[in-house]
C-alpha cells in the first residue's frame, strides 16, 4: 500500500497515525508512507525520529474574532492545497488518511478534489473543526467514540477505536519491573500524571495528599511534567516522601509500564483513554478545562457512564478528593476488578487493524 498520512500540531493527532503506520508495516512490510505535517507542529520532531519521510507546509487556524489574520489563513490554506496536490501527484498514494489538525484539512481536501480515496480518523467524542469541514468531501470516516457518530453527516462512519490502543495492547508481555523506578514488584501501584508538560492543579493536589499517600498499603508513581519537577520538589521540601512514593519528572517508556499499573490518575485525552481501555486499567480522569469544546469532559463521561472510570472535575480537585477516590480504588480489589472489566469492555485492542480495513475499503470502492 502507498499511504499518505496527514495530521499534526499536537501529539493527539500524531501518535495515532504513527501507531497505524507501525501496524500496517507489520502486516504489509512493503508499505510506503509519506507523512505531511505542519511546519511548526510537533510532527517535525516526532515523525523523522520514527523513521518516516516528512513533508511540511505552513498552515494556521481561523481567529474567532474579525482579524486580518483570517485573510492570511485563507491564503495559506489555498497555498497548502496547491502544495498537497503536487505531493499527491508525485507520490501517487493509494489512499490518504487524515488524523486531524489544520494541515490535514488542506491535504485531504486536495486529495478529494483529485479523486484519491480519502479517510479521516476522529479521536475524540467531540469532532474537531478540521474533520467537520472534511466530512463532506472524504470517502470514509473512522471514529474512536460512539458519541462522534451523530456529528458526521455521512452514512459511512465506522467505529475503529484509536490505533494507540492496539500499539499498547501488543506490549502486555513487557518484562518491566517496578524496581527500575525504585518501587517494589507485587505491590498494587497507582500512576499519576498530567501529560508530558504536567498539570499544575493535579500536581498541587498530589502535594496536598502526600502525607496520606505515605501511609497507604499501595505504592504511587507520580510524574510532575519535566518543566514542573523543580517546582513540585520545592513544594515538597521538608515533607517526608514515603518509600512507597516515587516522584519523577516524566514517565519514560509508558507503553511498557502501563500493563503493570493497577490504577491511573490522568487527563482525559483521547490517546490516554484509548490506552487504558485497551488494557482495562481502572482510571480516575481529571479532564483538562483548557481544550476545545470541553471535549475531555465528554471523553471522560463516555467512560464514567459505562462504569469504566471515575471523574473529578478540575474545579473540584484537591488533596482530599484525590486521596478519597484513590483509596476507593486501591484499597478495594473488587472495585478495581469490576472497573477493569468495564474498561476493557469498551476498549479497542484491535483498533489499527480496524482502521486498516477502512483504508482498504476506501481503496476497493474506488477501484469498482
Curated annotation (Swiss-Prot):
Main location: membrane
A Pfam match: Glyco_tran_28_C
GO MF, one example: undecaprenyldiphospho-muramoylpentapeptide beta-N-acetylglucosaminyltransferase activity
Enzyme Commission (EC) number: 2.4.1.227
Subcellular location as annotated: Cell membrane
Keywords: Cell cycle, Cell division, Cell membrane, Cell shape, Cell wall biogenesis/degradation, Glycosyltransferase, Membrane, Peptidoglycan synthesis, Transferase
Name of this protein: UDP-N-acetylglucosamine--N-acetylmuramyl-(pentapeptide) pyrophosphoryl-undecaprenol N-acetylglucosamine transferase
UniProt organism field: Limosilactobacillus fermentum (strain NBRC 3956 / LMG 18251)
Amino acid at each position: 500500500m502507498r499511504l499518505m498520512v496527514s495530521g499534526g500540531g499536537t501529539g493527539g493527532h500524531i501518535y495515532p497515525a504513527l501507531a497505524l503506520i507501525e501496524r500496517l508495516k507489520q502486516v504489509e512490510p512493503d508499505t510506503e508512507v509519506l507523512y505531511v505535517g505542519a511546519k511548526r507542529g510537533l510532527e517535525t520532531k516526532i515523525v523523522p525520529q520514527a523513521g518516516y519521510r516528512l513533508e511540511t507546509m505552513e498552515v494556521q487556524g481561523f481567529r474567532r474574532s474579525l482579524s486580518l489574520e483570517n485573510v492570511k489563513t485563507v491564503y495559506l490554506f489555498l497555498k497548502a492545497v496547491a502544495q498537497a496536490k503536487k505531493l499527491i501527484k508525485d507520490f501517487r498514494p493509494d489512499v490518504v488518511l487524515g488524523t486531524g489538525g489544520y494541515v490535514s484539512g488542506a491535504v485531504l481536501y486536495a486529495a478529494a478534489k483529485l479523486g484519491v480515496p480519502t479517510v479521516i480518523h476522529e479521536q475524540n467524542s467531540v469532532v474537531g473543526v478540521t474533520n467537520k469541514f472534511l466530512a463532506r468531501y472524504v470517502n470514509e470516516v473512522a471514529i474512536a467514540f460512539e458519541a462522534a457518530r451523530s456529528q458526521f453527516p455521512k452514512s459511512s462512519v465506522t467505529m475503529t477505536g484509536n490505533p494507540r490502543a492496539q500499539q499498547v495492547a501488543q506490549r502486555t508481555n513487557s518484562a518491566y519491573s517496578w524496581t527500575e523506578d525504585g518501587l517494589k514488584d507485587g505491590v498494587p501501584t497507582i500512576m499519576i500524571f498530567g501529560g508530558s508538560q504536567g498539570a499544575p492543579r493535579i500536581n498541587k493536589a498530589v502535594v496536598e495528599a502526600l502525607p496520606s499517600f505515605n501511609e497507604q498499603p499501595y505504592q504511587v508513581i507520580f510524574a510532575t511534567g519535566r518543566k514542573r519537577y523543580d517546582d513540585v520538589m520545592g513544594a515538597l521540601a521538608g515533607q517526608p516522601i514515603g518509600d512507597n512514593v516515587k516522584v519523577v519528572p516524566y514517565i519514560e517508556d509508558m507503553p511498557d509500564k502501563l500493563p503493570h499499573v493497577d490504577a491511573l490518575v490522568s487527563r482525559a485525552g483521547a490517546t490516554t483513554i484509548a490506552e487504558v481501555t485497551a488494557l482495562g486499567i481502572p482510571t480516575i480522569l481529571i479532564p483538562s478545562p483548557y481544550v476545545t469544546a470541553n471535549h475531555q469532559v465528554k471523553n471522560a463521561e463516555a467512560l464514567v457512564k459505562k462504569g469504566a472510570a471515575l471523574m473529578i472535575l478540575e474545579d473540584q480537585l484537591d488533596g482530599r478528593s484525590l486521596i478519597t477516590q484513590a483509596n476507593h480504588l486501591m484499597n478495594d480489589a473488587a472495585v478495581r476488578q469490576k472497573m477493569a472489566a468495564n474498561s476493557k469492555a469498551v476498549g479497542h485492542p484491535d483498533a489499527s487493524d480496524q482502521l486498516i480495513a477502512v483504508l482498504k475499503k476506501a481503496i476497493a470502492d474506488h477501484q469498482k
